[in-house]
């Protein structure tokens, strides 16, 4: 289940807002310019599915976003717990950074944790299957796929180069809890 926790940026262990309600999550994220919505697949997708199978399952939604936002590149990332490069991949996204284009991800399977630093607040967004998140360009954030990552996501880009992060060099991401999927422990 999707979850949003909001913290003051100086209290990484004490959220002042927690919700698993879709409407509340969407409303809170809308306040900082983030789009959060749910999609439904026309067929089941699991890690290991081809990019073509994944995109075919969501073709209508993909085409709608391309037409609305002018995305030039769409790809699929699929990572399972046995991926030999999982630690390297996790580390790449785990530091605070921003992009010069919107970061748009749709979770086809599995889960991951996007954390957004906006003003003096930190928004921890657990994205799960069927969640679409769109983080505006220039927004400070990081992503944690967890120590045993399991997700398939469709990624949308306006730039042909794909994912390009601009890192801030701050340690804020290190001060906040690491992602442990909800089913893996009783409390986050």
UniProtKB/Swiss-Prot annotation:
Species of origin: Xylella fastidiosa (strain M12)
Residues marked May play a role in transmitting local conformational changes (site): 102
May play a role in metal incorporation in vivo (site feature) positions: 96
Name recorded for this polypeptide: Acireductone dioxygenase
Gene assigned in the entry: mtnD
Entry-linked InterPro entries: ARD (IPR004313), ARD_bac (IPR023956), RmlC-like_jellyroll (IPR014710), RmlC_Cupin_sf (IPR011051)
EC class name: oxidoreductase
Keyword Oxidoreductase set for record: yes
GO BP annotations, alphabetical order: L-methionine salvage from methylthioadenosine; L-methionine salvage from S-adenosylmethionine
Keywords: Amino-acid biosynthesis, Dioxygenase, Iron, Metal-binding, Methionine biosynthesis, Nickel, Oxidoreductase
Cofactor: Fe(2+); Ni(2+)
EC annotation from Swiss-Prot or TrEMBL: 1.13.11.54, 1.13.11.53
Signal peptide limits: none
Domain of life: Bacteria
Function: Catalyzes 2 different reactions between oxygen and the acireductone 1,2-dihydroxy-3-keto-5-methylthiopentene (DHK-MTPene) depending upon the metal bound in the active site. Fe-containing acireductone dioxygenase (Fe-ARD) produces formate and 2-keto-4-methylthiobutyrate (KMTB), the alpha-ketoacid precursor of methionine in the methionine recycle pathway. Ni-containing acireductone dioxygenase (Ni-ARD) produces methylthiopropionate, carbon monoxide and formate, and does not lie on the methionine recycle pathway.
Residues annotated as binding Fe(2+): 97, 99, 103, 141
Binding-site list for Ni(2+): 97, 99, 103, 141
Textual note on the cofactor: Binds 1 Fe(2+) cation per monomer. Binds 1 nickel ion per monomer.
UniProt site positions, description: Important to generate the dianion: 105
């Amino acid at each position: 289940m999707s979850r949003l926790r909001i913290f003051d940026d100086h209290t990484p262990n004490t959220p002042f807002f927690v919700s698993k309600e879709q409407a509340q999550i969407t409303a809170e994220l809308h306040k900082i310019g983030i789009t959060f919505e749910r999609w439904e697949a026309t067929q089941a997708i699991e890690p290991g599915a081809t990019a073509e199978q994944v995109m075919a399952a969501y073709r209508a939604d993909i085409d709608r976003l391309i037409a609305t936002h002018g995305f030039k590149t769409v790809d699929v990332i699929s990572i399972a717990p046995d991926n030999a490069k999982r630690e390297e991949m996790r580390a790449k996204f785990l530091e605070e950074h921003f992009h010069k284009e919107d970061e748009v991800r749709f979770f086809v399977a599995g889960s991951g944790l996007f954390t957004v630093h906006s003003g003096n607040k930190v928004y921890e967004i657990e994205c799960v299957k069927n969640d679409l998140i769109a983080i505006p360009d220039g927004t400070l954030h990081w992503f944690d796929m967890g120590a045993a990552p399991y997700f398939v996501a469709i990624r949308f880009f306006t730039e042909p180069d794909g994912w390009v992060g601009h890192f801030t060099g701050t340690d804020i991401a290190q001060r906040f809890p690491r992602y442990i999927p909800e089913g893996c422990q009783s409390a986050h």
